[in-house]
Amino acid sequence: FKKKSSLPNFFELYQKNVLILGFGRIGKEVAKRCKGFDANIYVYDPFVENKDIESNGCIPINKEEGLHLADYITVHLPLNTKTKNFISNKEFSLMKKTSIIVNSARGGIINEKALIEALKENIVLAAGVDVFEKEPPDQHNPLFKLPNVLLSPHNAALTLECRKRMATEAAQSIVNYLTDKNKINFSNLVNIKELNLQI
């Protein structure tokens, strides 16, 4: 066979350290999938007890330690005053130069300017971005020109199956609210104030 020297670099999850930021429903689903690849799964979520993280086969860790240890960082936090710019210059400085960060949660959790700088300066290896601080993003957004970022237009949840599931869950939540409020999980609601719900 002719030797080919320009093979692309692919990376495995096998025995790699994955840091999940946010361990709600989506974070837990990500953990399940990472387990299938035999990854070491670390979780940072100050609102989830360590025993709950451990019972899902994951290792609880503080934010700084997790960022320093992780090969892959995946963000699954809600956007609020506490999580805005949750990842910025300081956090990028803690990461491995070989780390890959993925945000499919909300734009603004990762400071976009800091992300662009980290990618340009090879502070981190690469990023996957499904969400932006401004949506739709400006056509001149520097992320579009970087070779080490994979972008998608906030469509990570737009599979046919996912849309059907969301519609079914929304309808079931309405039924539960009208018939028996004890059946609905209010902890997942992000707009309780706007809905003026009496809980």
Q: Model-derived features: where do they sit?
A:
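Rossmann-like adenosine-cofactor binding region
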Residues: 46-142
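Short glycine-rich hinge loops at helix-strand junctions in the catalytic core
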Residues: 38
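Short beta-strand "acidic-cap" motif of Rossmann-like dinucleotide-binding folds
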Residues: 41-43
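Conserved hydrophobic beta-strands of the Rossmann-like cofactor-binding core
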Residues: 17-19, 101
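Rossmann-like dinucleotide-binding domain for NAD(H)/NADP(H)
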Residues: 98-199
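Phosphate-binding beta-alpha-beta segment of Rossmann-like dinucleotide-binding domains, i.e.
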Residues: 1-17, 29-32, 185-188
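Glycine-rich Rossmann-fold phosphate-binding loop(s) that bind the pyrophosphate
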Residues: 23-24
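Gly/Ala-rich phosphate-binding loop of Rossmann-like dinucleotide-binding domains
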Residues: 31, 35, 119-120
